[in-house]
Every structure is written in structure tokens, then in C-alpha cells.
Amino acid sequence: FHKLPLIKGKTAREELQERGLWEDYRKQYPYHPMAKFYQDGTEPMTNDADLSYYGVVSIGTPPQSFKVIFDT
């Protein structure tokens, strides 16, 4: 069992807002909050671009480090 430090980074939304690209992103990938109530038998996934916590995981010898987003 390993413990990883939790690091707070910028969300994709924050990055896009800083660059002035958030509105274009939302137009290209619209958010439909009522979609989950449709009676078509599917469960749509949405990307709100607001994941901001991650950890650094190192694997191998020599170690290679990866940023891993903890989204659940």
C-alpha cells in the first residue's frame, strides 16, 4: 500500500479561461445538464473540465513520473 501526496493544480477550465478560450470550448462541446433525464436508456458522460487534483506516480527503474488525475 502506497500513499501519494495530493497536489492541487489548475483545472482545464481555469487554463482555458486564462487563455480566453473557454467560450469557444463550450460552444464546441456544449453542456446539456438535462440529458441525464432523457428516457433513451443511455447515460451520457459530460466533461466539465474541472478536475484539479492529481498525484505524481513513478514507475520503473530508472523511475518515470506521470501526473495521474484522481477523478473518482
Swiss-Prot record:
S-S bonds: none
EC primary class: hydrolase
Signal peptide: none
GO biological process: proteolysis
Cross-referenced SUPFAM superfamilies: Acid proteases (SSF50630)
Residue ranges of the propeptide: 1-37
Ranges of residues in domain Peptidase A1: 53-72
E.C. numbers: 3.4.23.-
GO molecular function: aspartic-type endopeptidase activity
UniProt keyword annotations, A-Z: Aspartyl protease, Hydrolase, Protease, Zymogen
Family affiliation: Belongs to the peptidase A1 family.
The protein's name in its UniProt record: Pepsin-2
Organism per entry: Thunnus orientalis (North Pacific bluefin tuna)
Upper classification of the organism: Eukaryota, Metazoa, Chordata, Craniata, Vertebrata
